[in-house]
Structures are given as C-alpha cells and as structure tokens.
Amino acid sequence: MQECRINPKALLGQCPQAKALLQGSAKYPDIKGKVMFYQTEYGVMVAAEVMGLPFRMNQCDRPVFGFHIHEGECCLGNAEDTFAEAGQHYNPEEYPHPYHAGDLPPLFGNSGYALQVFLTERFCVREIVGRTMIIHSMPDDFTSQPSGNAGEKIACGVIKSCCNC
C-alpha cells in the first residue's frame, strides 16, 4: 500500500498561510465562518468551517451553497447586491466556467453547519491574498455562464495573510 503524502491532521494543527473570516449579510447575520489556506507541494489545502447557514427541516431539501473565491478586495456593496465589490469569480486565466481558479466545491449544509477540507491546484496561496471568499444562497450549477447561477451572495470575507495566528 502506498503511503499518504499529505497529512491533513498535521497541517490543520499548524498556522495557515492565509485565512478569511466570513460574515453573513444583513439578511443572514448569523452566518460566521473561517476558511484557512495551507500551501503544500501538491497544491493548496483549503479547510472551511461555517455556522449559521440557512436550513430547512425537510430531509429532502438540505441546502447546498455555492462557494467561491472572488476577484474583489472587499466585502462592501449596495442595496441590490450586499457584497457587490467582491466582484466576479477569481479567474486570472479567463477560463470559461466552471474552470475559474476561484470555482470551489460546494458547501453542504448540515443543520446550519458546514465543514470541508479539500486540495486544489488552481491557485497558490500568495495569489489569493487580498481576494474575497463568498458563500452563495444556491449551489453552483457548474454550467451557466459566467458564474454558475449560484444566487445571492450571503456571506463574505477577505483572504488575509497569516503571519501570526
């Protein structure tokens, strides 16, 4: 049997190279979360933990949320779009959707809570510092152009470099 190359448990015990603290919009004030970014030799390990997500009791209607890195540098907005200045999906290579560097796996809500860890080669940590993390109200369909029809932006956080955690 081949030995595992990345030890997520060991990485999660270390200080990440960057992190974003997520806060819900005025309509979703209970959403709070943290996304941590760890650079590895195989790509970036992303660890996300989010609380206060909207949920319904119907077992067949469990929410799935679009989860992206956006190109903007702040979470300001207006009456129509709470986080308008977060901009579009981070897409430095101008690839079609769903191949944007900022297209990430969706968050699966569990009674208002989501936890996920994944590895991606779409970016390096240094490339995304200063960008924004967005949670959308609906899942990304990974088809619609330009950004997957993921609905309203319900939470946002700026990705910041971590020197001292």
Label every PLM stretch briefly.
Residues M1-C165:
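N-terminal leader/targeting pre-sequences
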